[in-house]
């Protein structure tokens, strides 16, 4: 018999039962024959220096009683759950039989984690991000702003005079409060299909759908066409006159470059950028130098469109220009 076999054989007593090594005596344990049901350990090697309570060898105390008051692991520490369900000190002794352990899980999972390909697991729940509006529209009668602001979050919207409440794709002028001005009410009732705004790939297009004439004041468009910033366009639902591009991001980037350029150019570009985010549309009634009403605030029914992207860009440019040191002088 080899030395290895002799060492392994010394673990058993004369009856072939697994005994406790003499090395345990220094820990205050009695070296006596263990219960016969431990023989089911088979070829499992006994762990070195295992701290076993002396009560485990007491023939008058069941082997399971010594763990009766032992704290359970956190994953099984469920209120009103008996610790007897997990009290076997050496679970491998019953490896051949099906375990009676029935761990309890919460009734509702707080976070559900699922693998997503090669990406790392993210334990935080994900919620769809709220889509930001690309423009805000206000309704006016003369100088009075009425109703709630309309925020456009979908690429294409309409502003019309049809009945019914507004929704994410449509702003209804008839659903807005009225200033009780008879002219305003009359115009609102004739707006009909109104206008359409379509914003895609950095371009904003306005299309006339109503049979009425629409007047548009767009400083950015006037700048690109070398017209006075207060110039007013007259559109109607006929041929080429019904559709017009009123904003272009690429053109706007060029103006932003000027605003960040030398001081002499920056002073002019700053003022222009400030109004490039504003578009004013009047229904039925015109205004401007060729009309009796010079300003849009003299009209009974009109809307103001605020484009968020150029407005945010202006805020950024304005902050940068005010933070950096200026070279030159203002006169």
Swiss-Prot record:
Gene3D superfamilies to which the protein is assigned, alphabetical: 2.60.200.10
GO biological process terms, semicolon-separated: anatomical structure morphogenesis; BMP signaling pathway; cell differentiation; dauer larval development; determination of adult lifespan; egg-laying behavior; negative regulation of dauer larval development; pigment accumulation
Biased composition (Low complexity): 175-185
GO cellular component assignments: heteromeric SMAD protein complex
Alphabetically ordered keywords of this record: Transcription, Transcription regulation
A Pfam cross-reference name: MH2
SMART domains noted in UniProt: DWB
Domain MH2, residue spans: 134-331
Signal peptide: none
Keyword field contains Membrane: no
Classification via InterPro entries: Dwarfin, SMAD-like_dom_sf, SMAD_dom_Dwarfin-type, SMAD_FHA_dom_sf
Transmembrane segments: none
PROSITE patterns assigned to the protein according to its UniProt record, in alphabetical order: MH2
Stretches the record annotates as Disordered: 168-187
GO molecular function terms attached to this record: DNA-binding transcription factor activity, RNA polymerase II-specific; I-SMAD binding; RNA polymerase II cis-regulatory region sequence-specific DNA binding
Keyword rRNA processing belongs to the record: no
Cited function: Probably an atypical receptor-regulated SMAD (R-SMAD) that is an intracellular signal transducer and transcriptional modulator activated by TGF-beta-like daf-7 signaling. Plays a role in TGF-beta-like daf-7 signaling in regulating entry into a developmentally arrested larval state known as dauer, in response to harsh environmental conditions; partially redundant with R-SMAD daf-8.
Oligomer and partners: Interacts with R-SMAD daf-8 and co-SMAD daf-3. Interacts with daf-3 in a daf-8 dependent manner.
Descriptive protein name: Smad-related protein daf-14
Organism: Caenorhabditis elegans
